Amino acid sequence: MKKKRMEIVLSAGLALAFSLVFYAFNTPLGASIGSDNAMYLTLGTALANGYAPYTQIFDHKGPLLYLLQAVPQILSGGYSTLAVFIQEAVVLFACLMVLRAMAREMGVSAWGVQLFYLALICSLTGGGNLTEEYTSLPTLLALYT
C-alpha cells in the first residue's frame, strides 16, 4: 500500500513538473498566450458566459473541445489561465495513472513508462492547451481496455 501511494505521489509530482515547464501558455510561472490557446480560451469563456457556439461565436473546431475549455472558466468564475493549467495538469496526471496501470499489468517499470511517454509528448505540447493533450487520455484508456 505504501509503495502504491508513493507511486501516485511521484506521478502527481511528475505531472506538475512537466506541466510547469511544457504547458507554457497557461503556467502560473508566467503565462504566454498562444494563438490556438487564445482561441480556445475565448470560446470556453464565451460558452461559460452563455454564448451559443457557431452562431454567436465561431471557430472551426468541434464542440467538445470548447466544452472542455468552458469547464475551467465556469469553475473559476471567469477568464482564468490558471484554471486551464490545473485542468491540463489533472488530465496529464490521469494519463500517467493509466500508463502506470498498463505498466503494472505488463510487469515493467511504471516510472520508466511514464518518463518515456513524457519524452514522446513534450514535442507535441506546443505550449499546452492543444487538442493533443486532451485526446491522449481517451486514447490511452482505449489501449488499456
Go through the PLM ranges and name each one.
Residues 143-145:
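Structural signal for the C-terminal ends of transmembrane alpha-helices
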Residues 90, 96-121, 136-137, 141:
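Transmembrane-helix signature of polytopic, membrane-embedded enzymes
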Residues 22-59, 71-74:
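Extracytoplasmic loop-helix module adjacent to an early transmembrane segment
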Residues 63, 67, 76-94:
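Loop-to-helix entry region of an early transmembrane alpha helix in multi-pass inner-membrane enzymes
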